């Protein structure tokens, strides 16, 4: 940094002789510091006998309003001449002494550089320098043309602590900070800034505390900012704490507004390659261009234990995000959250782009975008090519095109995460790709142990969990209703990849105001991939080509069922409308009805079946139409009969059957995940720790009365029991399960119920009934 001083010094390497009328008491030592009693004394610091490495102390408040009328005959500065200006361009301009404000106030200090030089109260605080216990109010510091400005110092290599700034205005083209222009391997701690910071002439590095926090050893700690920060339209790297951060920022509390600027704007910093810890930003962001976010514009470092709670984060073009614009491949974000309203042409609740790691984090609020095609909006991350784990979004997503509750486009890894907000396109029949969790999962995308519960409304290719899947999705589910115009499903709109151990419970219908819809499937609209161990229980209502599980299958579906009610007018099928490829070990247990008297081409199991069905069943009691030769017709009461399934491949491996169940259920719903052997190498599925919907609890019985089993789902930890009552309400038996944590538990209820008779089985936790199941 010395080289920067030398270069910028130009013709000013010769120190000017500055007049001063200061007459300070003291000896300049730690025991007897020079005493600054008035403005004339302040101007004398660092000049003549008052050395740049001496000790100084304020003994009174200083009114510096006289600086407004001062000019320099030898320098470009109007007003106060910065301490160290006499040695500008040399190392002697560093203040390496101690300046103790003793909690006194310097007010109305005015310093303006008209030409090519920076300004502040100090030119530079050196590596040994200390400025502390100082208050400044109503000061005005400005540089018109080049480089840096700050209320306290242009540059800091030392220590600035316990400083309070109120109503100051600082402006410069670049490296502009409320306290310091550039903090290079120095420390700024226990400081407060309230005022205005302006970046002019479309330059970079503007911050509420420091313009640039450079060097790995630079530290900003325990600071508060309430700044009105503005930049010209093409200014870059703006943050309410620091324009850029290469060091450490810890415990920052931020309020205010950051307005204009081009790219890389953040509530803490525009760009971070260092560490940010325990920061809270409540500042609103209004920017013109990309990578604008509530905390950091662009991150390649570490961010942890931090949050954004902002009323508004807005970007005119190319995207805004609640927490970070871009998290690069080296970036790590953990234990952080955002609660904000985000609006741009593309909006992300937490991030626009993630190539690094995000874990244990969440987003809440609302995500909106302009009503135009070609842009993406999501509740958590717009595009993920990295890793996201143990995170969630409760944000609502409202826009037109390409929407998702958690990640719009995923080609990375997502594990143990969920989304609960709605995904709505304003009831438009146009627009493409909507997912309650992910919009599009690419061929390299892997999603495990995740779920979505929000309603999804989209023009086409809409799914309760994913709009379009080309990758792998394992052990995930969706419970939200889906309304669309074409190619939509309770779990997926289109599937070209692999879906294992998944289910959907939401109902399907048309967009409001549109009676017509096409290709709806209770689980998936169009399948051109591989699905194994999956089911759908929601009702399906679509005019053209609906199916209880899938509308059109041109892939492979194994070990699957649909139990909802299906209604349609044209080519409506119980399990599938059109099957072109392979179905195996599948059944339809719901009902099939025509939605209009002018219906055409129903199919109790399938309407068109040029493909193969190996071991398929349908509920003949639920179909009022002609028998279907594509699958075996079975009375609903007989669907739990074990002999029906003797021919099914690996039935005992994948299915559970007992007199407590109306039809077979899949083993994976009990928390056991049997290995699936595909065409290639075996797919190994480790038993996952499925996340559970907050507030959702469940008791699911299976097996026989003599060997009764249960799947217990808990949304919180607590002392858990299962109680069995007879029809008179008399308690018959209590099965103590002890302390159970949040999650899915497989429990043994052998001997809990009698061999005959109706019993009410109740799940209790901490003395409160959570769920009931009637055993007939």
Q: PLM features: what roles do these ranges have?
A:
Residues 1-21:
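Sec-dependent, cleavable N-terminal signal peptides
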Residues 677-709, 715, 730, 769:
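Residue-level detector of functionally pivotal "anchor" positions at catalytic/ligand-binding pockets or at interdomain
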């Amino acid at each position: 940094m010395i080289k920067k001083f030398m270069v910028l010094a130009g013709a000013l390497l010769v120190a000017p002789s500055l007049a001063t009328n200061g007459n300070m008491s003291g000896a300049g030592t730690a025991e007897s510091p020079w005493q600054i009693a008035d403005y004339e004394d302040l101007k004398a610091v660092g000049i003549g006998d008052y050395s740049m490495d001496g000790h100084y102390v304020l003994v009174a408040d200083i009114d510096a309003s006289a600086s407004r009328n001062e000019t320099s005959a030898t320098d470009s500065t109007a007003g106060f001449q910065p301490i160290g200006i006499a040695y500008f361009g040399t190392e002697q301009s560093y203040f390496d002494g101690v300046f103790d404000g003793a909690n006194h106030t310097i007010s109305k200090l005015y310093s303006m550089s008209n030409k090519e030089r920076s300004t502040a109260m100090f030119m530079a605080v050196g590596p040994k320098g200390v400025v502390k216990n100082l208050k400044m109010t109503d000061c005005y510091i400005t540089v018109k043309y080049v480089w840096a400005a700050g209320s306290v110092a242009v540059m800091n290599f030392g220590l600035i602590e316990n400083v309070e700034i109120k109503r100051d205005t600082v402006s410069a083209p670049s490296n502009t900070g409320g306290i310091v222009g550039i903090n290079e391997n120095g420390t700024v701690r226990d400081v407060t800034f309230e005022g205005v910071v302006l970046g002019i002439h479309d330059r970079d590095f503007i911050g509420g505390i420091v313009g640039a926090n450079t060097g790995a050893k630079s530290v900003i700690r325990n600071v508060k900012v309430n700044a009105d920060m503005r930049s010209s339209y093409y200014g870059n790297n703006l943050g309410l704490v620091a324009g850029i951060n290469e060091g450490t920022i810890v415990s920052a509390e931020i309020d205010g507004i950051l307005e204009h600027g081009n790219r890389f704007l953040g509530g803490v910093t525009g760009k971070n390659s260092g560490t940010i810890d325990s920061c809270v930003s409540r500042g609103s962001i209004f920017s013109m261009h990309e990578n604008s976010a509530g905390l950091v514009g662009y991150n390649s470092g570490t961010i942890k234990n931090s949050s954004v709670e902002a009323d508004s984060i807005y970007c005119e073009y190319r995207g805004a995000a609640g927490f970070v614009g871009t998290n690069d491949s080296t970036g790590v974000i953990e234990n952080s959250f955002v609660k904000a309203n985000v609006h741009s042409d593309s909006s992300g609740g937490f991030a626009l782009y993630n190539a690094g790691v995000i874990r244990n984090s969440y987003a809440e609020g609302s995500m909106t975008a302009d009503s135009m095609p070609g842009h993406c909006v999501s509740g958590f991350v717009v595009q993920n090519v990295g890793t996201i784990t143990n995170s969630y979004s409760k944000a609502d997503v409202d826009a037109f095109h390409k929407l998702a509750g958690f990640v719009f486009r995923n080609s990375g890894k997502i594990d143990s995460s969920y989304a609960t907000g709605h995904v709505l396109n304003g009831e438009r029949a146009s627009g493409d790709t909507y997912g309650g969790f992910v919009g599009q999962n690419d061929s390299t995308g892997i999603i495990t142990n995740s779920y979505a519960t929000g309603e999804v409304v989209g023009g086409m290719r809409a799914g309760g969990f994913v709009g379009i899947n080309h990758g792998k999705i394992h052990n995930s589910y969706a419970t939200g209703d889906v309304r669309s115009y074409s190619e939509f499903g309770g779990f997926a709109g289109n599937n070209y990849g692999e879906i294992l151990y998944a289910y959907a419970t939401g109902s399907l219908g048309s967009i409001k105001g549109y009676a017509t819809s096409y290709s709806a499937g209770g689980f998936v609209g169009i399948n051109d991939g591989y699905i194994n161990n999956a089911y759908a229980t929601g009702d399906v209502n679509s005019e053209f080509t609906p199916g209880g599980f899938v509308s059109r299958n041109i892939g492979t579906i194994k070990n699957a069922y649909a139990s909802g009610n299906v209604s349609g007018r044209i080519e409506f099928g119980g399990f599938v409308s059109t099957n072109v490829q392979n179905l195996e070990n599948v059944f339809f247990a719901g009902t099939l009805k025509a939605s209009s008297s002018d219906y055409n081409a129903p199919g109790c199991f399938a309407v068109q079946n040029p493909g193969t069905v190996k071991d398929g069943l349908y509920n003949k009691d639920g179909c009022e139409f002609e028998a279907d030769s594509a699958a075996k017709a079975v009375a609903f009461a007989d669907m739990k009969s074990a002999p029906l399934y003797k021919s099914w491949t690996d039935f005992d491996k994948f299915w559970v059957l007992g007199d407590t169940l109306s039809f077979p259920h899949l083993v994976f719903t009990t928390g056991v995940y049997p290995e699936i052997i595909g065409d290639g190498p075996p797919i190994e599925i480790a038993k996952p720790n499925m996340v559970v919907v907050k507030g959702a609890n469940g008791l699911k019985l299976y097996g026989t009365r003599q060997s009764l089993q249960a799947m217990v789902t808990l949304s919180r930890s607590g002392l858990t029991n299962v109680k069995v009552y007879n029809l008179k309400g008399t308690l018959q038996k209590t099965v103590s399960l002890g302390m159970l944590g949040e999650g899915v538990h497989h429990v043994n209820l052998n001997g809990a119920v009698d061999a005959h008779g109706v019993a009410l089985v109740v799940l209790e936790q901490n003395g409160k009934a959570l769920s009931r199941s009637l055993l007939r």
